[in-house]
Amino acid sequence: MQKIKLWFGVCRPYSLFISASPVIAGLLAFRKIIDIPTAVVTLLCAMSLQVFSNLVNDYYDFVRGCDKAGRSGPQRPLAEGIVNEKQMRTACIVALSVALLLGAYLVWVGGWVILLVGVLSALFAWLYTATRFSLAYLGVADIICFLFYGPVASAGTVFLQCHEFSLAAFYAGCACGCIAVCVLASNNIRDIEDDRAVGKRTFPVRFGKTAAQVGVALILLASVAFAVLGFGTLWLLFLLVPDIFLYVKLLKAEGKAYNICLFRFVLLDVLYVVAFGVAFWL
């Protein structure tokens, strides 16, 4: 039981909703009867890829010397000596294997389009911190984060249901993708000095803390606009209220307070999906 609890924490369970939200949002925007088995497998596959991405990220950040014991961010298992490198590599293989098994069913349902999406998703999850050309170190992770935790996931989910492109699902996914970028931004603003020291050229490192904060404000505004477009109802403008509250908290944050901001943005993602659920029934 203790070992299960340990690995559950290593997988960063709080992050799983970031991968689940565009899948759920896409299904809600679809507004039609869905094939439940396909929807469930889609959700599990997305979450498996998220776990794989988390584990790979932990492994390569440790190998590169980016993660160290006593860091200001959430505890990292390798850096703290909780698990060793061999165990982490094995966990990466297991997570990827689960995603591939689930993905095989989705390819059978959706064909070559889903195969392409799946291959790119797994590839970018690996490339995020792996190899000398890792996306996180090149400063383009925000774009990939928006796409694959947003419109790619939501539109792909609906394509599996009807083999058609859904603009509503695309917009709903864009809203989720924006919040995912805010989660990443909270992490990167917090780690700006540590990342600069190891050559990790994130957006805050390249353009500064102020530019990153302004970027978050614009992204939050865009998320509400996409939500309204996806569900065609102006009452979703109420999402501006929690957006403003969390943005003010982000501006005031220092050090480990960014960890609270990060988790609050995850909760904001939950709120968005709940709001989409209400919009679905109205």
Question: What are the language-model segments listed below?
Answer:
Residues 17-26, 143-158, 204-209, 263-277:
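Small-residue-rich segments of transmembrane alpha-helices in multi-pass membrane proteins
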